[in-house]
Each structure stands twice: as C-alpha cells, then as structure tokens.
C-alpha cells in the first residue's frame, strides 16, 4: 500500500493523552477566554465570537449557559465541530507556551519518518491535528513532524469516521483509488467502514485501548506496533 491514513488517539499516541491531558487542560483554561466575550453572542462581533456563535442560540445566551453547554459536551465526548474548533484555539496557546507536548509512540514516529505518503484522519479538528504533530515529545524536546505529513482530514472535511462515505471522500480528495490506501485505527467500527469503502485497514492495539472481542480479533487484522508496517 502506498498511502497510509492514520487515526490519532489510541493509534499513534496513547488514548489517555486526549482524555487525561488535552480535555482537562481545555476545561481548566477555556473560561478565561470567555471574559471578553459579550453575551448573548453575536457572530458579527468577530474573533472568538465567530466560533462560539456556531453553538445553539440558547447555549450562547449567557456565560453560564455556555459553560454548562461546553462542560456537557466535553463530559459526553460529543464530536461537536464548534467545540473542536474552540478546543483547538485553547490548545494552540497551550502548545505555544510549552504546557502541552504530544506523546506520540516511538514506532509511530519512525513509521511516519520512513513513509512517503502519510495522511491523518481524526475527529479532532485539522487545526488541532497540526498542533499535535508540530509539538511531538521526543525525550523532552518538542519535535515537528508536520513536514512528513501530506494532509489532514476531520469530521468537517471528510465526515464521521464510522461512515463508509467518509473514506470514499478522503480517497477522492487525495486523488487515488480507495484500494491504494491503508487506514489504521483502534476503533473497530472505523476499520469496518474503511474496509467497506474498499481500503485496506488494520486495528491498532495499544495499552489502555478498549478490549477487542474474540470475534473482532478473528475478523480484523490487528497490530500492536508500526515497526513491521
């Protein structure tokens, strides 16, 4: 396969990084971003208001209602495009300050470095993906892997990850046949959708990932490292 399409959490970095590091960092920091926002939010205000105005009208009527809405989305891990954009803004500053570095697995770093055509597909925004891969933790230093990546896809540019059509769109956007792509993910339903679209696909098994059923282990090709890929 000449083109690799990679999921992020649970695949190239620990699933705990997002839930135990990025999400808590966002939840702690985001209220400070709302101090200068006027409520009810009007998109014409510009700046951050343009992003937040994408939330339901009732959610942006007051700062307390907005906080409740955001906290609920985060708690339920809802893949909301507006939330993802706001998170990306907060994380951008966190990476810039050195508060955040991405713990990408060594075998994944080596795979990206030796591969000729690697794309990323995550439910996190493209902006957040670029931030993560431009601030990879290598022995305490922040390393930029983005020059090795050919492109990025998220739920706004490609669609939801458990839908076959999303993978067909990605192949079309890359300009290749789906059969030329191999998709790696820890999520069996995502792997299933990619296979249905005609891509090759493998389930990535990492510490902390959801346990695979015996049926899934037999039905899908599984790897625990990119070393042999």
Curated annotation (Swiss-Prot):
Indicate the segments annotated as coiled coil, or none if absent: none
Q: How is the cofactor bound?
A: Binds 1 Mg(2+) ion per subunit.
The UniProt subunit note reads as follows:
Monomer.
Q: Where in the cell is it found?
A: Cytoplasm; Nucleus
Could you tell me what this protein does? Bifunctional enzyme that catalyzes the enolization of 2,3-diketo-5-methylthiopentyl-1-phosphate (DK-MTP-1-P) into the intermediate 2-hydroxy-3-keto-5-methylthiopentenyl-1-phosphate (HK-MTPenyl-1-P), which is then dephosphorylated to form the acireductone 1,2-dihydroxy-3-keto-5-methylthiopentene (DHK-MTPene).
Known cofactor(s): Mg(2+)
> Keywords in UniProt for this one?
Amino-acid biosynthesis, Cytoplasm, Hydrolase, Magnesium, Metal-binding, Methionine biosynthesis, Nucleus
Where, in this chain's numbering, is substrate bound? 122-123, 161
Q: Could you tell me which species this protein originates from?
A: Clavispora lusitaniae (strain ATCC 42720) (Yeast)
Catalytic activity annotated for this protein? 5-methylsulfanyl-2,3-dioxopentyl phosphate + H2O = 1,2-dihydroxy-5-(methylsulfanyl)pent-1-en-3-one + phosphate
Q: Which GO terms describe its biological process?
A: L-methionine salvage from methylthioadenosine
The residues that the entry says bind Mg(2+) are: 7, 9, 186
Asked if the record carries the keyword Metal-binding, the reply is yes
What protein family is recorded?
Belongs to the HAD-like hydrolase superfamily. MasA/MtnC family.
Give its E.C. classification number.
3.1.3.77
Provide one Gene Ontology cellular component. cytoplasm
Q: In which pathway does it act?
A: Amino-acid biosynthesis; L-methionine biosynthesis via salvage pathway; L-methionine from S-methyl-5-thio-alpha-D-ribose 1-phosphate: step 3/6; Amino-acid biosynthesis; L-methionine biosynthesis via salvage pathway; L-methionine from S-methyl-5-thio-alpha-D-ribose 1-phosphate: step 4/6
Single GO molecular-function term? magnesium ion binding
Protein name per Swiss-Prot or TrEMBL: Enolase-phosphatase E1
């Amino acid at each position: 396969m000449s083109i690799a399409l990679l999921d992020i959490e649970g695949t190239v970095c620990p699933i705990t990084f997002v839930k135990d590091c990025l999400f808590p960092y966002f939840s702690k920091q985001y209220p400070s971003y709302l101090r200068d926002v006027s409520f009810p939010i009007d998109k014409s205000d510009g700046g951050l208001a343009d992003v937040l105005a994408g939330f339901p009208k009732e959610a942006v009527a007051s700062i307390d209602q907005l906080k409740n809405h955001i906290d609920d989305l985060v708690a339920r891990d809802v893949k909301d495009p507006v939330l993802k954009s706001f998170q990306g803004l907060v994380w951008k500053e966190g990476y810039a300050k050195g508060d955040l570095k991405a713990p990408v697995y060594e075998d994944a770093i080596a795979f990206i470095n030796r591969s000729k055509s690697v794309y990323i597909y995550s439910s996190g925004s493209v902006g957040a993906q670029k931030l993560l891969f431009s601030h990879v933790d290598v022995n305490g230093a922040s390393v930029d892997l983005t020059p090795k990546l050919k492109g990025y896809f998220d739920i706004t540019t490609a669609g939801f990850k458990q839908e076959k059509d999303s993978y067909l769109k990605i192949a079309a956007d890359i300009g290749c046949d789906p059969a030329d792509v191999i998709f790696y993910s820890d999520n069996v339903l995502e792997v299933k959708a990619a296979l249905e679209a005609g891509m090759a696909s493998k389930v990535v098994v990492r510490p902390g990932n959801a346990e695979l059923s015996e049926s899934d282990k037999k039905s899908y090709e599984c790897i625990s490292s990119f070393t042999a890929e």
